[in-house]
From Swiss-Prot:
Gene Ontology terms describing biological process: regulation of pH
UniProt keywords, alphabetically: Antiport, Cell inner membrane, Cell membrane, Ion transport, Membrane, Sodium, Sodium transport, Transmembrane, Transmembrane helix, Transport
Gene Ontology CC: plasma membrane
Signal peptide coordinates: none
Protein name: Na(+)/H(+) antiporter NhaA
Gene3D superfamilies referenced in this protein's UniProt entry, alphabetically: Na+/H+ antiporter like domain (1.20.1530.10)
Source organism (scientific name): Shewanella baltica (strain OS155 / ATCC BAA-1091)
């Protein structure tokens, strides 16, 4: 278990650096003479036509709907593994991160709504600060190496996975519109086929891939966000074959470097380019960026800590072995790194609104996430022993 987590985190730390480079490059291009090239590239129309099927979208939507579906496939595989065999496989193991994740979603959303209540346009962004970027948060923790107890790493991993599960539910319930009955019927048939493959013990990934592609197209056309197709596919792929091998884990290990070193950096590059030339102090302190930044910087750690404390005091959960509240607190701060996940929800929340709102949301996400990363890192570094645990 410890070796697997260390391998996971070693990739995440390198991926975190690459994410920062992608964000910096996007901001540089969006605020330089290259801005036209940057916007033109992301707006390039890409068309796929097979018979009667015709999909044409700007490149940025192929990234957000296509590449991110693969990312959510990976998230789904991780969630399934942890639920069946890992850090969430028993009530005792799952209790604390579950309560922490719930608090870490409710309180930031409440903070955002405090600043945006009454505005029907900006209220749609309530879920933006509720997300945690699992890759970036774990990457920041990985910078502290062996000083971090394994049980603390598992706690953050489990919390982030439950948080991702919550985001999946939020997308399905609140950011799916204009539903198409025909597409939903096709999607349902594809899901039935995937479940049937699982029930029959099929371990070859090819039939899952074919039905998964059909499901993705159907969900894309249905009005439900296409990334949910990735999660459904993941839950249908068997965790264990009869010979003891794991098709699910094999795919997870194959996808992980692609997600870390390609999908998330590309997503960050495509979505983090905020033009700040027309922004002033009044813009920076407007309800959207302030609500998101404070939701991430304050709402997240307060929610995680308060709900965790209540759960422990009521004996509904217990602290991880060898970990006290002084270690949990900085990890709670790290949960405020919303970054790519918050930007993704922002792209859904303000998809049909004035582009200004999307820029403000991304700006608030960047400010809040960077502050959460800095506070979490230096705080955890201060409370941990100097030698490996």
């Amino acid at each position: 278990m410890e070796k697997a987590i260390r391998n996971f985190l070693s990739q995440e730390s390198a991926g975190g650096i690459l994410l920062l480079v992608a964000v910096a490059l996007a901001m540089l291009m969006a605020n330089s003479p290259l801005s036209g090239l940057y916007q033109g590239f992301l707006g390039t129309d890409v068309q796929v036509k097979i018979g009667e099927l015709d999909i044409h979208k700007p490149l940025i939507l192929w990234i957000n709907d296509g590449l991110m579906a693969v990312f959510f496939l990976l998230i789904g595989l991780e969630v399934k593994r942890e639920l069946l065999e890992g850090a969430l496989s028993s009530v005792a193991q799952a209790s604390l991160p579950t309560f922490a994740a719930i608090g870490g979603m409710l309180v930031p959303a409440g903070v955002y709504l405090l600043f945006n209540y009454g505005d029907p346009v900006t209220q749609a962004g309530w879920a933006i600060p509720a997300a945690t970027d699992i890759a970036f948060a774990l990457g920041i923790m990985a910078l502290l190496g062996s000083r971090v107890p394994v049980s603390l790493k598992v706690f953050l991993l489990a919390l982030a996975i439950i948080d991702d599960l919550g985001v999946i539910v939020i997308i399905a319930l609140f950011y799916s519109t204009d539903l198409s009955t025909i597409s939903l019927v096709i999607a349902s048939l594809a899901i039935a086929g995937l479940v049937g493959l699982n029930r029959k013990g099929v371990t070859s990934l090819l039939p899952y891939s074919i039905l998964g592609l059909i499901l993705w197209v159907a969900v894309l056309k249905s009005g439900v966000h296409a990334t949910l197709a990735g999660v459904i596919i993941a839950f249908c792929i068997p965790l264990r074959a009869k010979d003891g091998s794991s098709p699910s884990e094999g795919l997870e290990h194959s996808l992980h470097p692609w997600s870390t070193f390609f999908i998330l950096p590309v997503f960050a590059f495509a979505n983090a380019g905020v033009y700040v030339g027309n922004m002033n102090l009044e813009t920076l302190i407007s309800p959207v960026p302030v609500g998101i930044a404070l939701g991430l910087m304050l709402g997240k750690p307060i929610g995680v800590m308060v709900f965790s404390y209540i759960a422990v005091k009521l004996k509904l959960a217990q602290l991880p072995d060898g970990v006290g509240w002084k270690q949990i607190a900085p990890v709670a701060a790290m949960c405020g790194i919303g970054f790519t996940m918050s930007m993704f929800i922002a792209s859904l929340a303000f998809e049909h609104a004035d582009p200004m709102y999307g820029d403000l949301a991304r700006l608030g996400t960047l400010i809040g996430s960077i502050m959460a990363a800095l506070v979490g890192y230096f705080w955890l570094s201060k409370v941990l022993p100097n030698k490996g645990v």
